[in-house]
Amino acid sequence: YSSLFTALVFWLILKWEEAADRPHADRWIVLIAYLMGLSIGVHLLNLLCIPAIVLVYYYKKFPNPTMKGTLIALLVSFAIVGLMMYGVVQGLVEVCGYFELLFVNTFGMPYNSGVYAFVIILAASLIWAIWETMQDEIHPVRMKISFILSIVLLGIPFIGSGYVIAVILTAALTAYLFMSKKVNIKMLNTILVCLMVIVVGYSSYALTLIRATADTPMNQNAPQ
């Protein structure tokens, strides 16, 4: 399945390249993000397609590419791979764990109550952020706050152990959004939709934990 997702994702970026100048071409990007989320639940091999995807995107959007631009595109792709591997894949579970500890250990609520609360809050945050980027009359402050909140809840800044890196990355994102004179709203909307479908696809990994909790006769992923 991992090889299938890898081949399919690369084929889809070529389909996007053909239709990049047409309306609603970004739907191919969203489909790629969803398939990447599904593939993460199987194997991380699919993330190796990101540098190729970024290069195809760069060469299509910039008709006169340069060596400097190519190197920058590669660096951006490596950063995206790092954010996916150590941000979304691990950070999402880490933030969910913080909620679980807060609700169970601090509030004295039943097990998994923090997980349910986190899923509801994350879904509400993503829907709010996407809704803010689709309004006819944009409210910049609300849009930026909802975007930052969604990024934090997705665990993207939580790279490594501790809170220092998370605080620095969140502060840098906040400073960039509020200090920039012009923010690309379409880009923010595309990022949010892609992240949302990645999480939906990544949720397929929950099957491993659900099956392990059921205590089947062959249980190699037992939480205990």
Predicted ranges, named:
Residues 1-6, 10, 14, 107-124, ...:
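Membrane-interface micro-motifs in multi-pass membrane enzymes
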Residues 29-41, 149-159:
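Membrane-interface alpha helices of multi-pass inner-membrane proteins
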Residues 26-27, 63-75, 107-117, 136-147, ...:
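Membrane-interfacial entry segments at the cytosolic side of transmembrane helices
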Residues 45-57, 90-91, 163-173:
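Transmembrane-embedded, aromatic-rich helix segments that form part
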Residues 3-11, 29-32, 45-51, 120, ...:
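Alpha-helical transmembrane segments of multi-pass membrane proteins
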